From Swiss-Prot:
SMART domains to which the protein is assigned, alphabetical: Fn3_like, PA14
Entry annotated with the keyword Electron transport: no
Active site, renumbered: D269, E616
Biological pathway: Glycan degradation; xylan degradation
The organism of origin for this protein: Xylanibacter ruminicola (strain ATCC 19189 / DSM 19721 / CIP 105475 / JCM 8958 / 23) (Prevotella ruminicola)
Biological process terms in GO annotation: arabinan catabolic process; xylan catabolic process
Molecular function per GO: alpha-L-arabinofuranosidase activity; xylan 1,4-beta-xylosidase activity
Protein name: Xylan 1,4-beta-xylosidase
Signal peptide bounds: 1-19
Quaternary data: Exists as a large polymeric species, presumably as a homononamer.
Cystine residue pairs: none
EC number from the UniProt entry: 3.2.1.37, 3.2.1.55
Organism superkingdom: Bacteria
Record carries keyword DNA repair: no
């Protein structure tokens, strides 16, 4: 194999005439010993190149090309033939850390399987987004529902985020006692990072109180470092108290390494070091920015122009020493040895994972199980749910009923199959009418003609997309895709235009011939970020070269039977990301009454609405009413959907509303216009089956909200204010649907808790009996909160334990929870530390964070 030949040649060069194994080539030595030896053989220029996220090969020493940047937010990302799980904010709603471990064990297996196939079976080389270092999990706190990246997190609570984050890391990295790590995971974005997206490169957070810093923003990072032994920490873009996070000695050295004992790698967010001198102006240029980041403790720079290329100049100018550089190089080399990436694959157990481990039936079953457990039943008037199969004709409508990209979330891979909500319902309900109804935000309806009236040059229905892994459409195409639904893709959030296509430096051509079945006006809608051109019958209609998503509308005035050859040419430009939307459609005004007329004789309507990852996400080129740059400016349901639901209610329909979103939606009007409300998040490849299972009673919902659902925009504090006052269940108690809330098709009764002194190092063991008093088997999540009675300025309550119990009808199960010293630890202003103070504490336990759902007892320390 090429790999073995490369290694053999490198060894020959290194051994020379002595034919003696060098220390760094000896797999029996520790990773640290090998890294120290290898570092000593590098030139300063080579060291600088190794400190980039895209590290080139150094053949003379047998060092291969290596990429530090890959993603596995909810499954292996940026590649095809993978298992796509629900978005993390939804998986947090499962309150099931054991199942979450299974999810990420599968994700790491699929990552290793594709890596092994490429590197060893195909004799290839490392690729960006396909390497063994994955920048997951995102353990920032979802403090404000307007943050577009909140969907990537495990919700608003520090404890829930910590517990779930530990399982993510363990699933990705594999057993600690293994010889090599399966992957390297990364806790991001350190620290105090949760929007806005549009200010992240310039923000300076100077209003974060010590209490909020230690009680809210830091616990998850500390837990992942100390309990999960996470191997990477990513420093964030913004400044904290005037210092960029990637240049903060306090964050990276004093807290992370000195206080918490972190021994591994710090990586920068992409472009964060360049922000020092381009946006924050805290450094004068790349050389000074580099020295600041390196001296503070940032080991690897992810970037575009790469400030770290100036590292040798910084050393020559005396801004830092080569000995300082060596500390960072040794850490990153330790990582590569720890992954087995530099050793013969026969020594690495993970290198034996075959490509057949990708996208298996077993992994799909886990995706389905997780999707079911994420679903939260928020409202069920008169027990309208579950529906009876085929008892009557029902309708399913709405913009998310048949929306595959919505199901996948952001930072996603592309699965081999996706079950939309429409697909799932169709599989159970034969008496069914489907009407798209409306767009997510637009008050026009686009009647798509791709599937019915468009034919590709090679005779297939729809639109053909041809892709090249260069920007000139040159040479052999990389891949081809076909579309019978509108194209809607973006590289923002690490999506790809086509499976396995790079997210940078590519080009595409989209082609079809449209034949008008009727005379009239049709439109070709093209919206893109990058360089894009539209040709109709060989004539150029426009050319755009732009970094911001730009919509275009080209009218086709057609006679019956008239043909139009349509071609869109695209190439990426050096922007944040690329995007493309294409549709050939008839533009119709929304007519609620016309749609309702089509529902004659139908009483029950499933409306699938909400928003989508194309509207909320990371630094996106979106600027429409309610949305800005990836964030939301309003948490209300988009007006077009709200009005549609009101019209259905006014027509006497019973509405089951399925909300798909990665964040909380203000649904107060919908509690009146809808009979049932189901929160489905972005549920992954099996999400349609999971939603249908819940709607028709094949699965009893047991998910609990991982975030607070507020009543309206007016309840939200200033988005740019990082104070926790008035935010989340910990400092706000007037929610529409509170954190930890979720209904079931059965009923549960929580018994009296039994609290005993622990003998295993914890303070107390807490046993809470729960009885299923209904007629259906179901699951209930018992939640334990602590209220510090001697701390009037502290949180109203803080989650400190939970357990999801599966309980058969008429049976009782017991939640067994532990309270440790850390469970009763809060910020103490007198000593400026987190500590457990003597005094009275309330233990609150029950089925949600709402006071009426909790019982309480008092303990004294």
């Amino acid at each position: 194999m090429k790999y073995q030949l490369f290694l053999s040649l490198a060894l020959c060069v290194g051994l020379g005439a002595s034919a003696q194994t060098l220390p760094y080539q000896n797999p029996n030595l520790s990773a640290k010993e090998r890294a120290v030896d290898l570092c000593s053989r590098l030139t300063l220029e080579e060291k600088a190149m190794l400190m980039l996220d895209e590290s080139p090969a150094i053949p003379r020493l047998g060092i291969k090309k290596f990429f530090w940047w890959s993603e596995a937010l909810h499954g292996a990302a940026n590649m095809g033939n993978v298992t796509n799980f629900p978005e993390p904010v939804g998986m947090a709603a499962s309150f099931n850390p054991h199942l979450l471990f299974k999810v990420f064990d599968i994700a790491s297996t699929e990552f290793r399987a594709q890596y092994n196939h490429r590197m060893y079976d195909l004799n290839g080389e490392d690729m960006k987004m396909r390497s063994l270092s994955v920048w997951t999990p995102n353990v920032n706190i979802f403090r404000d529902p307007r943050w577009g990246r909140g969907q990537e997190t495990y919700g608003e609570d520090p404890y829930l985020t910590s517990v779930m984050g530990v399982q993510v890391v363990k699933g990705l990295q594999g057993p600690e006692d293994a010889r090599y790590r399966k992957l390297w995971a990364c806790a991001k974005h350190y620290a105090v990072h949760s929007g806005p997206e549009y200010t992240r490169h310039t923000a300076n957070l100077t209003d974060v109180s010590a209490r909020d810093f230690w009680e809210t923003y830091m616990p998850a990072f500390k837990t992942l470092v100390k309990d999960a032994k996470v191997r990477e920490v990513m420093c964030a873009y913004q400044r904290l108290d005037d210092d960029p996070c990637c240049g903060s000695t306090r964050l990276l050295q004093q807290i992370l390494r000195d206080e918490w004992g972190f021994e591994y790698l710090v990586v920068s967010d992409c472009g964060a070091v360049s922000d020092f001198y381009e946006n924050h102006k805290s450094s004068s240029d790349a050389v000074h920015g580099t020295s600041k980041a390196v001296l503070a403790g940032t080991d690897v720079e992810c970037g575009f122009n790469y400030a770290y290329k100036s590292l040798p100049e910084a050393v020559r100018k005396g801004l830092l020493s080569e000995k300082e550089v060596d500390k960072h190089v040794i850490r990153l080399l330790e990582g590569r040895f720890d992954l087995g990436e530099m050793d013969d694959p026969s020594l690495v157990e993970w290198s034996k994972i075959p490509y057949s481990a990708m996208s298996t039936k077993a992994s799909a079953n886990v995706a389905l199980d997780m999707a079911r457990q994420t679903i939260v039943l928020l409202q069920n008037k008169n027990n309208i749910l579950p529906l009876k199969k085929n008892a009557e004709k029902i309708a399913i409508i709405g913009p998310n009923a048949h929306n595959e990209p919505m199901m996948w979330g952001n930072y996603n891979g592309t699965p081999n199959h996706t079950v939309t909500i429409l697909d799932g319902v169709k599989a159970k309900q034969k008496k069914l009418v489907y009407i798209p109804g409306c767009d997510l935000t637009n008050d026009k309806v686009m009647e798509c003609h791709l599937a019915t009236d468009c034919v590709t040059p090679d005779g297939k229905k729809g639109l053909k997309g041809t892709f090249w892994n260069n920007t000139e459409m040159a040479g052999k195409p990389f891949t081809t895709e076909y579309y019978t639904k509108p194209v809607n893709v973006t590289t923002a959030g690490m999506h790809v235009f086509a499976p396995n296509l790079p997210i940078e430096d590519f080009s595409a051509k989209y082609e079809t011939t449209f034949t008008a079945k009727e005379a009239g006006e049709y439109v070709v809608n093209v919206e893109s970020t990058g360089h894009f051109e539209l040709y109709v019958n060989g004539k150029q209609q426009f050319v755009n070269h732009i970094w911001r998503a730009t919509p275009t509308r080209t009218v086709l005035k057609a006679e019956k039977g008239q043909k139009f050859d349509i071609e869109v040419r695209f190439q990426t430009v050096k922007t944040w990301g690329a995007s493309m939307k294409i549709d050939v459609a008839r533009e119709l005004n929304i007519d609620y009454q016309e749609t309702i007329a089509q529902l004659k004789g139908i009483n029950k309507v499933i409306f699938c609405g909400g928003i989508a990852p194309s509207l909320e996400g990371e630094e996106m080129p979106v600027n429409i009413e309610g949305f800005k740059g990836g964030d939301r400016t309003s948490i209300e349901l988009p007006k077009v959907q709200r009005e549609f639901l009101k019209a259905l209610k006014a027509a006497g329909k019973q509405v089951i509303y399925v909300n798909c979103s990665g964040s909380a939606i203000a649904l107060q009007p919908e509690t009146e216009s809808c009979d049932a409300i189901v929160q489905a998040w972005y549920p992954g490849q099996e999400g349609g089956t999971a939603v249908a299972d819940v709607l028709f009673g094949d699965y009893n919902p047991g998910g609990k909200l991982s975030v607070t659902f507020y009543k309206n925009d007016q309840q939200l504090p200033d988005y740019e204010d990082y104070s926790m006052k008035g935010r989340t269940y910990r400092y706000f108690d007037d929610a529409l649907f509170p954190f930890g809330y979720g209904l079931s098709y059965t009923t549960f009764e929580v018994g009296e808790a039994k609290v005993e002194a622990a003998t295993d190092g914890a303070l107390y063991n807490v046993q809470i009996p729960v009885t299923n008093t209904g007629t259906k088997n179901g699951s209930e999540t018992i939640q334990l909160y602590i209220r510090n009675l001697q701390d009037p300025d502290g949180p109203l309550k803080s989650l400190r334990g939970f357990e999801r119990l599966d309980i058969k009808a008429g049976k009782t199960a017991t939640a067994n929870l532990k309270l440790t010293k850390e469970s009763l630890e809060f910020w103490d202003a007198e000593t400026n530390t987190m500590r457990t103070k003597p005094g009275k504490y309330e233990i609150l336990y029950g089925t949600s964070s709402l006071d009426k759902d909790l019982k309480k007892l008092t303990i004294t320390l």
